């Protein structure tokens, strides 16, 4: 759906909801305002997880309220209806009508989907929204997912993440060798090339894996979520920045067959609810991370450190190699990479004299 059509649809949905008017399908002339739907949403998140999990639950509530209960959505935490990392397949085959997760969880099946979550040293949260909503990214995403019988919608944003929790100090490149680390997506592939053993485990297993030594290090999100999982009690060293996930976007995926059964006004309301959820989640993380960071700074058992420059330089070099190989893998990856990289280039130039320049100035005087 083009952005102009999307905004027009939102206005139609808002007007119909506020005024209580009948909704008549333009192509059939049939009044569908009394039709009701009960859907299931599967997610990758532990129950009640701040930000990610609660964001999915709030999305469902927002849709139900805006549709006057015409569309009710029951939310399942990861593992309740399907495994946490099986959301994509479950929604594609119709086990559930909706799913809430991160596109890079399915990189084995849809490699190019990683562009729609996060790319190492790539777009930050605001830049991702700009590319998706105005730069053609969302249209590419929707077209790419058609072959899997899915409709993707941006539905959450955490902002830049942290580099991860480590049970040993990282003072040089050599310290990465042999580490067993939970880090998904392209960041995981980059870390593998740096000598790390990349391991994928769902959020619910990270704490125990760190405690038992099954993991030496783990990247999850940032202070807000990491504290909620107790990761500060399982590892001592907390490194930044989140070079691998500068602006990770979450996705709502809808089974295409189910989507096609919805009246146009309900489709527009779902899209509007996702856009509101995207904004709300980013605000929640900005606030929650700031507060949780203060807690960690006051914890004598936690050391917050920057990754050494030589480590970041190596990770950037390896990231460039990984992304180049991904873009050469298939036609879809090449198309999406070109769109993404073209916008990253011009946006980075703008950031130098806007956001980055301001933050540099503020830090120099505060």
Residue ranges and their predicted role:
Residues 2-128, 145-366:
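N-terminal secretory/targeting leader peptides
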Residues 127-140:
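A gly/proline- and charged-residue-enriched helix-loop-helix capping module
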């Amino acid at each position: 759906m083009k952005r102009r059509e999307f905004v027009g649809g939102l206005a139609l949905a808002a007007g119909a909801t506020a005024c209580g008017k009948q909704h008549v399908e333009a192509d059939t002339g049939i009044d569908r305002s009394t039709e009701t739907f009960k859907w299931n949403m599967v997610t990758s998140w532990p129950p009640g997880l701040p930000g990610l999990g609660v964001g999915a639950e709030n999305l469902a509530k927002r849709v139900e309220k805006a549709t006057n209960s015409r569309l009710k959505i029951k939310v399942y935490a990861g593992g309740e209806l399907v495994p946490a990392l099986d959301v994509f397949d479950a929604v594609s085959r119709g086990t559930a009508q909706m799913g809430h997760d991160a596109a890079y969880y399915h990189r084995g099946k849809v490699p190019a989907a990683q562009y729609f979550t996060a790319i190492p040293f790539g777009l930050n949260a605001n830049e991702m929204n700009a590319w998706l909503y105005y730069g053609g990214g969302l249209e590419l995403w929707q077209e790419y997912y058609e072959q899997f019988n899915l409709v993707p919608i941006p539905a959450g944003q955490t902002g830049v993440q942290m580099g991860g929790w480590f049970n040993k100090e990282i003072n040089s490149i050599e310290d990465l060798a042999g580490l067993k680390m939970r880090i998904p997506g392209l960041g995981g592939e980059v870390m593998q090339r740096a000598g790390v053993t990349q391991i994928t485990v769902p959020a619910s297993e990270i704490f125990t894996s760190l405690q038992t030594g099954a993991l030496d290090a783990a990247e999850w999100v940032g202070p807000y979520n990491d504290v909620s999982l107790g990761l500060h009690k399982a590892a001592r060293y907390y490194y930044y920045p989140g070079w691998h996930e500068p602006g990770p976007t979450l996705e709502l995926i809808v089974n295409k067959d189910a989507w096609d059964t919805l009246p146009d006004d309900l489709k527009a309301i779902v899209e509007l609810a996702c856009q509101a959820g995207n904004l709300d989640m980013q605000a929640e993380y900005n606030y929650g991370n700031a507060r949780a960071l203060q807690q960690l700074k006051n914890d004598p058992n936690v050391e917050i450190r920057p990754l050494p420059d030589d480590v970041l330089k190596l990770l950037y070099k390896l990231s460039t190699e990984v992304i180049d190989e991904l873009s050469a893998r298939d036609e879809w990856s090449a198309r999406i990479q070109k769109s993404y990289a073209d916008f990253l280039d011009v946006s980075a130039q703008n950031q130098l004299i806007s956001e980055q320049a301001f933050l540099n100035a503020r830090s120099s005087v505060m």
